Each structure stands twice: as C-alpha cells, then as structure tokens.
C-alpha cells in the first residue's frame, strides 16, 4: 500500500513530529511504501510560541521526509496537492491539530483526491477539532477541512463527540505505547 502522511516531521520538533515519524516507521515495518510531506514553513516565526520550531537531532534514518508544504502560501497548496495526486497514494493521512491549518490541509486534500485512477482516500487523525479558546472562525475552518476528508481517527472520546457536529465517519484510536 502507498501511504503519504501530510504533517509535521523532522526538522520540526515536538509531539506532532514524533507521532508522524513513529507512525511512518510502523507503516514501513509492515511493508508499506510510506513518505511524509512536511513543512518548509509551518508557522511564521512571530506566531511560534516557543523558542524554536526546529530540532537539532539527526533526521530519522530510513524515512522518506520531503519538505514541501508552506502553510501560508495558497499557490504552494495547489502545487503540493497536484504533486500528491501524481504520486497516487492509496491513503493520504493528515494529522490535524489546529483550525489555522484547515485552509492549507483542506485545499491539498481536495486536489490530491481528484485522482480517479488511484482512488486516494483522505483520512485524518484529529488531536483537536475545535480549540479550547474557540471562535466562530474555528468552526468555519474546520468545516472546510472536514468536507474534504473521507474518514477520521480521533485521539479521545471528547474529540469524537466534537467531530460528530461535522458529520464525519469516526474510528477511535487504539492506545499507543511509548
């Protein structure tokens, strides 16, 4: 099976990157052709709440990680979606954590799945559907994103409950040991 993960990975640091990389390793260990498309720009520097977005560790060996996504450039989203469409993955897996990523991820997903020959399925792993400090724009952005996916995996029951408002097919995630 050909699986493309869209989201945070090396050289970015943190739990999102670690999760995506570990998931990719698991898919590879099961014999799947797996690649991660990560960011050239995840957040503009002035929006990043921490000291740095980047890790100083080596890139994970034996993982294909391509830095291609600019989260704030709509022209890049179109190019990235077209590139994914040409790759014809069986599954495009997106890790979603913030509605600010909805325009980027939603546009890429819609373009990528237009490939009828591959019949790419877009599956999302939701950490959060709506942030704790929610606003009306969060619901609009999340609706845009969820209308472009085929199914979802949620990380908690409360996230699954939040997602029901968007009429998405949900499967709960299994417990993952560290």
Task: Place the predicted regions along the sequence by residue.
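Short beta-strand->alpha-helix junction loop in the catalytic core
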Residues: 42, 159, 170-178
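N-terminal strand-loop element at the rim of the active site
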Residues: 10-13, 25-84, 159
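Nucleotide-sugar donor phosphate/pyrophosphate-binding loop at the beta->alpha transition
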Residues: 121-123, 128-148
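A short, active-site helix/loop in glycosyltransferases that binds the activated sugar's phosphate group
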Residues: 147-170
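Short N-terminal targeting/anchoring amphipathic segment
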Residues: 66-70, 79-104, 120-125
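A short, glycine/small-residue-rich beta-strand->loop->alpha-helix junction that serves as a flexible
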Residues: 7-21, 44-45, 97-102, 133
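Histidine-centered beta-alpha loop that forms part of the nucleotide-sugar donor binding/catalytic region
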Residues: 8, 95-98, 126-129, 172-178
């Amino acid at each position: 099976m050909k699986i493309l993960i869209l989201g945070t990975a090396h050289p970015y640091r943190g739990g999102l990157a670690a999760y995506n990389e570990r998931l990719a390793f698991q898919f590879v260990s099961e014999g799947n052709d797996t690649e991660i498309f990560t960011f050239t720009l995840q957040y503009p520097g002035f929006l990043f709440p921490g000291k740095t977005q980047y890790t100083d560790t080596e890139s994970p060996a034996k993982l294909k990680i391509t830095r291609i996504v600019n989260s704030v450039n709509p022209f890049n989203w179109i190019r990235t979606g077209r590139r994914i469409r040409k790759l014809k993955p069986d599954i495009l897996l997106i890790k979603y954590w913030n509605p600010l990523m909805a325009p980027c991820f939603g546009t890429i997903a819609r373009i990528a799945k237009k490939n009828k020959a591959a019949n790419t399925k877009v599956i999302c792993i939701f950490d959060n559907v709506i942030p704790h400090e929610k606003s009306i724009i969060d619901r609009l952005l999340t609706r845009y994103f969820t209308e472009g996916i085929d199914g979802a995996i949620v990380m908690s029951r409360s996230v699954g409950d939040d997602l029901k408002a968007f009429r998405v097919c949900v499967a709960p995630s299994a417990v993952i040991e560290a």
